[in-house]
């Protein structure tokens, strides 16, 4: 099969496929005869309509189907014969100059995978993040857990920061009400930044049953464009004040966190274990991000446009599905521009190609034991870890995510063993983010 592969721009290639008319016609005749056997046409018994009539009715569509099938088959044969590593799907175009009456020509335009050459990893710098979890971090986490279980009790006094208040309010701009500017029995916690600072400051010091006018200046960058940069006067009536009460760290508190016998020491051990696991996950993610950035620097790579577009479309669909899962039913019909996802898609495709090369060259495929360790780590935070492990192993497709993580872990370890590693110790707050 003599076919010339023409190089276009970057990774794009072109081949012209010749389909003999004799083959097209023979395959078309075969398809029409198959159609004849199934056809139900008025005036004829099933399968007994004349072939000539079948050809008149279905000949054009049958020939198009045959040409499409032959083009796909011929392109596959050419790709195998020429050892072409095709990325994505080809597009087929008609050839204007059909100079050979014996055959029909079609141009196949496609991309090939780039050659991936891993650069000198010893020249790359990688940041390895570390963090520790001690008694202070456990205390901090327990305090967060206490705040999450705050109870509010009604009090007869003026409102203070930290109280939950229930109010009626109506806002006006230049004496006129505005959309979203009024509500009844609206509850919020003072000092939690749920409302604008001037609004909250106006409520502090009020008692149940009191009303007052509070002037509020909306910021220029306020999310409500109709009121951004404007001044409103809110008439506020305070209906109820409730004081926050945090639970004591005792047996009842420990039981609420899943410690059956209420042992506070066991609870702290469990908190430390869970927090340590989460801290480890986060520092590993940051280290992995640094490793991936180093790999992108070490490899000059142009990702195939077809694969980038496919990944961008997948990311768009993923975002729409997330919206749907959050209750936005109409999100499935959103027309999200793929350009929103192109940068992320290009990074993912490039890293996929680099990792595949690195794993293949350095035999970094994970062992069964490594995959089992990842699954066990997933399961550890659940009430019945064995049930979770059994779920993963009940369907081999469910092991794809653990396998990918095991591969990435091997890659990270490999790069850390080659690159210049700078250790960076982070505090608990830096790792976990600000948690009040």
Swiss-Prot record:
One Pfam match: FKBP_C
Keyword Transport listed: no
Alphabetical UniProt keywords: Cell cycle, Cell division, Chaperone, Cytoplasm, Isomerase, Rotamase
SUPFAM superfamilies: FKBP-like (SSF54534), Triger factor/SurA peptide-binding domain-like (SSF109998), Trigger factor ribosome-binding domain (SSF102735)
Domain (PPIase FKBP-type) ranges: 162-247
GO biological processes: 'de novo' cotranslational protein folding; cell division; chaperone-mediated protein folding; protein transport; protein unfolding
GO-annotated molecular function: peptidyl-prolyl cis-trans isomerase activity; protein folding chaperone; ribosome binding
Top-level taxon of origin: Bacteria
Enzyme Commission numbers on file: 5.2.1.8
Main location: cytoplasm
Localization per record: Cytoplasm
Cell membrane recorded as keyword: no
One GO cellular component term noted in the UniProt record for this chain: cytoplasm
Reactions the enzyme catalyzes: [protein]-peptidylproline (omega=180) = [protein]-peptidylproline (omega=0)
Family statement drawn from the similarity comment of this UniProt entry: Belongs to the FKBP-type PPIase family. Tig subfamily.
Function summary: Involved in protein export. Acts as a chaperone by maintaining the newly synthesized protein in an open conformation. Functions as a peptidyl-prolyl cis-trans isomerase.
Domain description: Consists of 3 domains; the N-terminus binds the ribosome, the middle domain has PPIase activity, while the C-terminus has intrinsic chaperone activity on its own.
Protein name as catalogued: Trigger factor
Species of the source: Neisseria meningitidis serogroup C (strain 053442)
């Amino acid at each position: 099969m003599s076919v010339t592969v023409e190089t276009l721009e970057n990774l794009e290639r072109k081949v012209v496929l010749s389909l003999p008319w004799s083959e097209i016609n023979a395959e078309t005749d075969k398809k029409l005869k198959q159609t004849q056997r199934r056809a139900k046409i008025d005036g004829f018994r099933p399968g007994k309509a004349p072939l000539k009539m079948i050809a008149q009715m279905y000949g054009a569509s049958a020939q198009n189907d045959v040409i499409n099938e032959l083009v796909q088959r011929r392109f596959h044969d050419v790709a195998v014969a020429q050892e072409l590593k095709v990325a994505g799907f080809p597009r087929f175009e008609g050839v204007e100059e059909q100079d050979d009456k014996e055959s029909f020509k079609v141009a196949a335009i496609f991309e090939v995978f780039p050659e991936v050459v891993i650069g000198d990893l010893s020249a790359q710098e990688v940041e390895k993040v570390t963090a520790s979890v001690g008694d202070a971090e456990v205390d901090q986490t327990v305090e967060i857990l206490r705040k999450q279980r705050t109870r509010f009790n009604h009090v007869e006094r003026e409102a203070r920061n930290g109280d939950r208040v229930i109010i009626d309010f109506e806002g006006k701009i230049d004496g006129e009400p505005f959309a979203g500017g009024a509500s009844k029995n609206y509850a919020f916690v003072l000092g939690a930044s749920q409302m604008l600072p001037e609004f909250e400051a106006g409520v502090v010091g009020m008692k149940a049953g009191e009303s007052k006018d509070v002037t509020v200046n909306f910021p220029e960058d306020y999310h409500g464009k109709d009121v951004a940069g404007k001044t409103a006067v809110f008439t506020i009536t305070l209906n109820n004040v409730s004081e926050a009460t945090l639970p004591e760290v005792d047996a009842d508190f420990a039981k609420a966190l899943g410690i059956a016998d209420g042992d506070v020491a066991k609870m702290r051990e469990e908190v430390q274990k869970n927090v340590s696991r989460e801290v480890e996950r986060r520092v590993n993610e940051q280290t992995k991000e640094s490793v991936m950035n180093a790999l992108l620097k070490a490899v000059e790579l142009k990702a195939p446009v077809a694969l980038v577009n496919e990944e961008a479309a997948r990311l768009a669909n993923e975002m729409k599905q997330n919206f749907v899962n959050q209750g936005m039913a109409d999100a499935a019909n959103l027309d999200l521009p793929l350009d929103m996802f192109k940068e992320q898609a290009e990074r993912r495709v490039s890293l996929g190609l680099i990792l595949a090369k690195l794993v293949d060259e350095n035999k970094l495929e994970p062992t069964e034991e490594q995959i089992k360790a990842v699954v066990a780590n997933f399961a550890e935070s659940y009430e019945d870890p064995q049930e979770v492990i059994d779920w993963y192993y009940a369907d081999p497709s469910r092991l794809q995510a653990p396998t990918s993580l095991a591969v990435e872990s091997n890659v990270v370890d490999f790069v850390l063993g080659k690159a210049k590693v700078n250790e960076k110790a982070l505090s608990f707050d830096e790792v976990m983010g600000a948690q009040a």
